[in-house]
Swiss-Prot record:
Localisation per UniProt entry: Endoplasmic reticulum membrane
Entries under InterPro entries matching the protein: PIG-M
Superkingdom to which the source organism belongs: Eukaryota
Protein name, per record: GPI mannosyltransferase 1
Family: Belongs to the PIGM family.
Transmembrane segments: 11-31, 85-105, 144-164, 166-186, 233-253, 295-315, 340-360, 367-387, 398-418
GN (gene name): gpi14
Membrane disposition: Multi-pass membrane protein
Length: 425
């Protein structure tokens, strides 16, 4: 297999071929099977695009909870006169997968010092992953986020501060969750890494600190001055400007439905179907009772405390990619809604984490982690099949216990990731 990974064209070609085969198979399954290959969300996307093509708002389509940019990108799916163009969005998402994989290899070579062949091996964890290819070819837009997230990592590690700010602002506008990377990126960009001086700050700041050593108030002020490096300020301003410009533009075009569906809806979202989260049963009971409870908003507290505060502060100076992996894993694990598409949010960081991880150094441990993660999903899916296809009431105890087991496995894996990243140089 060494010769295979020595050729970027072969690896990229194989990843494209995998997705092409799945696209063709998906079209066949949709036409011949009662169980459809295409994700229901894809029909939501394309319906929204059709409304836009008629001069209406994408939010005229019920359950469209995304930026208008996505509906705009899928306008070619409304060109009914051109055969096959309804699948344009799937092809776009699949292509985005491949671009994200190419960026992964690029970062591994430029920032991690890997040889191109070794970088392609690890990038293939994403490029040749059938789960990744399946989700994108079913019509999930996560591949687009993959490009933005890896693009953000590349821009930061390349010290392209303006570009990193633009990508971060665009990513948060496109889908809320990339905001968690803001603290990690800002914390990582100290004075040493942005080239403006030593990590202890400028000469003026150091002189002030030495003069006021022992004075707590002045010491805190000095640390605050040290923290505000040019790169951190620049990145924050560019990201906020990009995010604000996009949101103001969309609000002018689509008014309150844009804000409500794209952002506010997620604060009190109730979604108990296809949900791996242990909150799913509580969401089901809440929906069945017709009453909203405080936990729908309180559920954000442990999730955000871990992913936005604790993990970036503890790990941010160790490894940026490793920190982003831990943040994303915590965010998804503790989210009140967790679907298969969300797994792609953290799987994209595996090529950066695996080379120095304990899972590679101890293969038995790696195999055990992989098996438990798959088994936990399989147990949940078996209960979900009983509910969705057999009509059995399996919310309690079946789905609830399966969700708790999956949650426990993921918390254990998160602990391994944090320990590995925390121990890195």
């Amino acid at each position: 297999m060494t010769s295979f990974f020595d050729s970027p064209s072969k690896v990229i070609g194989a990843s494209i071929a995998l997705r092409a085969v799945l696209l063709v198979y998906g079209a066949w399954q949709d036409a011949h099977s009662p169980i459809k290959y295409t994700d229901i969300d894809y029909f939501v996307f394309t319906d929204a695009a059709r409304y836009v093509s008629r001069g209406a708002s994408p939010y005229a389509r019920d359950t469209y909870r995304y930026t208008p940019l996505l509906a705009w990108l899928l306008l070619p799916t409304t060109w009914d006169s051109i055969p096959g163009f309804f699948a344009f969005g799937k092809a776009l998402f699949a292509l985005a997968d491949v671009v994200a994989g190419w960026l992964i290899a690029k970062v591994l070579v430029s920032a991690y010092g890997m040889s191109p062949s070794r970088a392609l091996k690890y990038a293939s964890v994403w490029l040749l992953n059938p789960m990744v290819a399946n989700i994108s070819t079913r019509g999930s837009s996560e591949g687009l986020l993959g490009v933005l997230v890896v693009g953000l990592l590349w821009a930061v590690l390349s010290r392209r501060v303006s570009l990193a700010g633009v990508i971060l602002g665009l990513g948060v506008h496109f889908k809320i969750y990339p905001f968690i990377y803001g603290p990690a990126v800002v914390w990582w960009f100290d004075a040493e890494r942005d080239g403006s001086g030593s990590p202890r700050g400028t000469a003026t700041a150091r002189a002030a600190r030495e003069k006021d050593d022992g004075q707590d108030g002045q010491g805190i002020l000095s640390k605050a001055v040290d923290f505000l490096t040019p790169a951190r300020i620049h990145l924050t301003l560019v990201a906020l400007a990009t995010f604000s410009a996009l949101n103001v533009s969309m609000y002018i075009l689509y008014d309150l439905p844009f804000a409500q569906n794209t952002y506010l809806h997620h604060l009190t979202r109730i979604d108990h179907r296809h949900n791996f989260s242990p909150y799913s049963t509580l969401l089901y009971l809440s929906a069945a009772g017709g009453a909203r409870t405080a936990f729908e908003s309180l559920a954000f507290i442990p999730q955000l405390l871990l992913s936005v505060v604790v993990i970036p502060l503890v790990l941010g100076k160790k490894s940026l990619a490793g920190t982003m992996l831990a943040q994303t894993f915590a965010f998804v694990t503790f989210n009140k809604v967790c679907t298969s598409q969300y797994f792609l949010w953290y799987l994209i960081f595996l090529p950066f984490y695996l080379p120095s991880s304990s899972l590679m150094k101890n293969p038995r441990k790696g195999i055990l982690v992989g098996l438990l993660w798959v088994i936990a999903q399989a147990l949940w899916l078996q209960q979900g099949y009983n509910l969705e296809f057999l009509g059995l009431s399996s919310f309690v105890p079946g789905l609830f216990l399966a969700s708790l087991f999956f949650f426990a496995v993921n918390v254990w894996i998160l602990g391994i990731i944090v320990e590995d990243v925390g121990g890195s140089a």
